[in-house]
Amino acid sequence: MEVQLGLGRVYPRPPSKTYRGAFQNLFQSVREVIQNPGPRHPEAASAAPPGASLQQQQQQQQETSPRQQQQQQQGEDGSPQAHRRGPTGYLVLDEEQQPSQPQSAPECHPERGCVPEPGAAVAAGKGLPQQLPAPPDEDDSAAPSTLSLLGPTFPGLSSCSADLKDILSEASTMQLLQQQQQEAVSEGSSSGRAREASGAPTSSKDNYLEGTSTISDSAKELCKAVSVSMGLGVEALEHLSPGEQLRGDCMYAPVLGVPPAVRPTPCAPLAECKGSLLDDSAGKSTEDTAEYSPFKGGYTKGLEGESLGCSGSAAAGSSGTLELPSTLSLYKSGALDEAAAYQSRDYYNFPLALAGPPPPPPPPHPHARIKLENPLDYGSAWAAAAAQCRYGDLASLHGAGAAGPGSGSPSAAASSSWHTLFTAEEGQLYGPCGGGGGGGGGGGGGAGEAGAVAPYGYTRPPQGLAGQEGDFTAPDVWYPGGMVSRVPYPSPTCVKSEMGPWMDSYSGPYGDMRLETARDHVLPIDYYFPPQKTCLICGDEASGCHYGALTCGSCKVFFKRAAEGKQKYLCASRNDCTIDKFRRKNCPSCRLRKCYEAGMTLGARKLKKLGNLKLQEEGEASSTTSPTEETAQKLTVSHIEGYECQPIFLNVLEAIEPGVVCAGHDNNQPDSFAALLSSLNELGERQLVHVVKWAKALPGFRNLHVDDQMAVIQYSWMGLMVFAMGWRSFTNVNSRMLYFAPDLVFNEYRMHKSRMYSQCVRMRHLSQEFGWLQITPQEFLCMKALLLFSIIPVDGLKNQKFFDELRMNYIKELDRIIACKRKNPTSCSRRFYQLTKLLDSVQPIARELHQFTFDLLIKSHMVSVDFPEMMAEIISVQVPKILSGKVKPIYFHTQ
């Protein structure tokens, strides 16, 4: 910051003098004001600083004081104290010399910054006469400037230590005065007492150190005028007592928690001199101290290491401890009383004025000098800025001073301006940014009561679709300001040493796939390179579902020939041969056994016959086996017989289940309607590709007519995506939010922002049904497959008969899955009723979303929402058929 010095008509502008920095500006400017001559003409009186009137009143009092009259009489009589004074009794030090007078040496006054000669100092200490320049002939009606302010009424630098000493930074002056006082006390104590008793004139030093506190107010007014002209605020100085205004290194406040470094201070000499000068101003100092007692009490405790105790002068007749104050800071101290400061410092609290009611002040700290403004500390006004938060509840973001609804903190009254979407019942949302915050500003909805919360506020299964729950450990470091622009996944559980799920034999549910941060929001490898569906027999690339299992073409042909043929294969080894892509032809017996174990069969009716054939083959080879091999054969038999309880096609459903698909949403950008809906459309396009692959791998689906296959997928894709999203929300975020994708999770704010809040609420309710009904992964897989065959045109499909048979087979498979877990027929019937009611509830949600997407497609150009090509074609061609009633869902129960 560069500021030209100048106070208008208060004093002449120095030619092109510039100071840099915030702190030296103030002190250097005041020094320039004092050292430059002020106005000397009558018209300059109107441009005097605000303290001019106060100076005139004090000057009038000084003129009538008996001491000044005595000094004036002594000056007229030619006494040694005949100093030249101004019209108001001030000590004139900088006046111009008269041409008629001989040019004398410049006066060396301690307050002028120059060091007097030793002889002059001794003479001044002993009260010897000194020559002073002649008075000026100009008009002296205007108040004198410069050091004439330091007249004979100056109170001895005691009460104005924070004003004059800090402004001029003349600590050496006090040392010189103290030395002179010691010389005067030691060498001329008797003569001094005699002169005081007889009313004899005293030295100029004694007169200089006597009087009232005129300079204190004058220096304050002058300091304020200079600071206002420079654009600096000095109101922070007014809130500190004089003892706390010593100038120091206030640019760099001590680090919190680190003991302060002791500053070099003028110890004993200055302390003794100051102790002797504080006698006549003790009352005022006491009042100033009591005025800020709440602040100074806690402030002094932290500065006990900086206090300096010194004994007073013996001549002063008092001995005490002098406590040097702390350094001066132009920034507001954290322990100051905020109430008084907010009334006068509007420009200082400019951010606070925009932020609404101020937060409670932080606990006092001995070195909390520099104000660290945090927008999260401004209470209710943070609601407007916190609307950009996408992954956290507002109640979990604000600090201890700003409380959300239901937090119970002192600033809960400001919760009226909080966004109405965030209620206390919503609980902890996705990825709390602030955590418990020491219990003060924890997440809303009871997160703060629980203290430390998990980083997600929920538990999710560690792997797969299992319902096992595992707790997360809170991450060590969160982002600053409570701002969460990245998804805070806990690093210990995200960094994996093994290969990702897309490298396994099949994609699986991708239960553990998480992205570290928003910068890692890249698509998984299965998006660029779709995972190769491996054959369950040899591990080669699978070509589809053959005979009830996902196999390659070679194993498909082998099983057909081996199962239909009459050949009996025997293993030359121990029935544990390795069957892979390169060694699958080495042992037909082990290969056929592995086909049976994978669930391959020529038909459901032949399952028992195939089991007997397998037992016969193993029985014929049992004569040459050991007891260990016989135990292994019994386990194989029991495993084959168990297929009657574990449906065969469940293995296929688990193998062909699509993996997790990312939306490619940029979470670093603020949420908007267009961005959220465009990301949802992009996610729908990517998921639709996986739905097509998944449907083609379903048992019996390829037997449908090609047109029927396309029609079924185009009509049921919305319901399938909603059903799968509800399951992901249940398994990943405990149905608290909508888990569309790892990089696109909808909390309450996003639900409102997307303008589809009612649809999102219904989808979240569907996700909660999975938990209330305790849906198992096997039931979910079968219900999802059945949902594909639950909507058809009113006119029917081209091969409606086969479609009905295929749908009935999937209904029977669902009933068989229910019967495997329950032995009571009544319990099975009740469970079947619950699951079918859940399937029926998906259709109204899908229809409502069809209407929303169709309306959005029409207005997409106006709202800047992007639709991928395939999504736009399906919505524009097939969705109108559903909305018009030409295509209707198939319900299990009457609606």
UniProtKB/Swiss-Prot annotation:
InterPro entries: Andrgn_rcpt, NHR-like_dom_sf, Nucl_hrmn_rcpt_lig-bd, Nuclear_hormone_rcpt_NR3, Znf_hrmn_rcpt, Znf_NHR/GATA. Phosphorylated in prostate cancer cells in response to several growth factors including EGF. Phosphorylation is induced by c-Src kinase (CSK). Tyr-510 is one of the major phosphorylation sites and an increase in phosphorylation and Src kinase activity is associated with prostate cancer progression. Phosphorylation by TNK2 enhances the DNA-binding and transcriptional activity. Phosphorylation at Ser-65 by CDK9 regulates AR promoter selectivity and cell growth. Sumoylated on Lys-371 (major) and Lys-496. Ubiquitinated. Deubiquitinated by USP26. 'Lys-6' and 'Lys-27'-linked polyubiquitination by RNF6 modulates AR transcriptional activity and specificity. PROSITE patterns: NR_LBD (PS51843), NUCLEAR_REC_DBD_1 (PS00031), NUCLEAR_REC_DBD_2 (PS51030). Residues 567-894 are annotated as: Interaction with CCAR1. Residues 1-533 are annotated as: Modulating. This is Androgen receptor. Residues 33-150, 178-211 are annotated as: Disordered. GO terms for biological process: androgen receptor signaling pathway; intracellular receptor signaling pathway; male gonad development; negative regulation of extrinsic apoptotic signaling pathway; nuclear receptor-mediated steroid hormone signaling pathway; positive regulation of cell population proliferation; positive regulation of gene expression; positive regulation of transcription by RNA polymerase II. The record marks E873 as: Interaction with coactivator FXXLF and FXXFY motifs. One of its GO terms (cellular component) is cytoplasm. Residues 534-607 bind DNA. It comes from Macaca mulatta. 17beta-hydroxy-5alpha-androstan-3-one binds at N681, R728, T853. The modification Phosphoserine is found at S65, S79, S241, S626. Residues 547-637 are annotated as: Interaction with HIPK3. Keywords: Cytoplasm, DNA-binding, Isopeptide bond, Lipid-binding, Lipoprotein, Metal-binding, Nucleus, Palmitate, Phosphoprotein, Receptor, Steroid-binding, Transcription, Transcription regulation, Ubl conjugation, Zinc, Zinc-finger. Residues 644-875 form the NR LBD domain.
